[in-house]
């Protein structure tokens, strides 16, 4: 009996365990989210994907005080779907997808909605993370993503300052990738 128990224990220890395949996908208009996303991907050994708009955002596009700026127009229309210039060839290989973005108007930018709707994310764990100077969390963004990807496991995620340390990112992300 002891020999069997030792054999089972050794088999379990020596058997390779499948680690979740991770992706950090992000949109960054000014570079703040890019910095956090790059640190996150490096700290958890994840693939990195830039959600790049077909038409890059200019400073005028990002002027939230102008109702006619591109970002204001997109964010005032919930059905707006800015076109993405980049594509993930095989999203099925990923188990956990961290989706990063700046908070615009208290939620995710419309290009994130384009990204979410572009793929079958059924069975994936989607973890939003964001940068923002004022919005305290990603709860509204997570709720929006849940509506767009109802068969995915979308968690509430977290907002980070641009100067967040890699160790903090790893500690936070580890709860979703084990």
Segments from the language model and where they lie:
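Hydrophobic membrane-insertion alpha-helices, especially the h-region
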Residues: 1-10
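N-terminal beta1-alpha1-beta2 submodule of the flavodoxin-like/Rossmannoid cofactor-binding fold
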Residues: 10-96, 106-108, 117, 167-178
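Short, structured coil segments at secondary-structure junctions
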Residues: 43-44, 122, 148-153
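Short, conserved loop/helix-junction motifs that constitute active-site signature segments
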Residues: 91, 117-123, 149
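Glycine-rich, N-terminal phosphate-binding loop of Rossmann-like dinucleotide-binding domains
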Residues: 101-102
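Glycine-rich, phosphate-binding/catalytic loops in enzymes
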Residues: 114-117, 144-146
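Short, glycine-/small-residue-rich phosphate/pyrophosphate-handling segment
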Residues: 127-161
């Amino acid at each position: 009996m002891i020999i069997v128990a030792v054999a089972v224990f050794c088999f379990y220890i020596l058997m390779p365990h499948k680690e979740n395949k991770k992706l950090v996908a992000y949109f960054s208009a000014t570079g703040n989210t890019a910095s956090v996303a790059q640190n996150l991907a490096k700290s958890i050994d994840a693939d990195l994907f830039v959600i790049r708009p077909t038409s890059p955002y200019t400073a005028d596009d990002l002027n939230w005080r102008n109702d006619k700026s591109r970002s204001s127009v997109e964010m005032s229309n919930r059905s707006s779907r800015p076109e993405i210039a980049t594509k993930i060839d095989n999203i099925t290989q990923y188990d956990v997808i961290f989706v990063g973005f700046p908070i615009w108007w208290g939620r995710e930018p419309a290009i994130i909605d384009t990204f979410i709707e572009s793929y079958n994310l059924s069975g994936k764990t989607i973890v939003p993370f964001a940068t923002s100077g004022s919005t305290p969390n990603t709860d509204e963004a997570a709720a929006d993503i849940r509506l767009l990807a109802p068969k995915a496991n979308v968690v509430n995620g977290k907002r980070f300052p641009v100067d967040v340390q890699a160790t903090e990112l790893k500690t936070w992300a580890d709860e979703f990738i084990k």
